[in-house]
Amino acid sequence: LEAVLQKYEIEVSMNQSNVEIKINPEQLIEVATALKSNLSFELLMDVIAVDYLTYGDVDWKTNNATSTGYSRAVKPTIIPEIDETFKGRFAVFYQLLSVSNNQRLTLKVFTSESNPPSVPSLVNIWSSADWYEREAFDLMGIHFDGHPDLRRILTDYGFIGHPFRKDFPTNGNLEVVYDEEKEEVVYQPVSISTRPGVPRVIRDRND
């Protein structure tokens, strides 16, 4: 692996069952081609997008009394305003499998800093990337440059936003209702409010 990829700027980490390679988006096409052609990673098993916004932060940071359900004594996480750039926020993980060598490999690449965030499409290398990339586009808003048919695949065409982003409101932007006067289904702003959905667990610092 190191011999084939020695000319690229990569970071390699290993555990008992998997190898992970972190690369720059500019090298994605060349590295992916080398992995398939020279190292027999014939199959792309999955494409996973991750949003690192507020990574490591938690809502439950309080020693106050608890008495009002899940919303008790909680200070909600503050989501920053969306900037024009996304430095270090979105990453894409490609899960590869070499059947002939019985080896798994994870390829990790952070997206461009542009808005929308983007990486090159790997459809021309592994055809299975087609719907995986469409899913990541639909749910995370990541653009895959060169994809032949990049459109939503899980949400409907009237959907606003990308629901797996951490700054997407948990109650959504729109709801679908039946309008009795128009006698048709219509979109309208959501009519519910949000609150923390995870109970607080109190632990003794000495445990």
What are these regions, as identified by a protein language model?
Residues 1-207:
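Terminal low-complexity/charged segments
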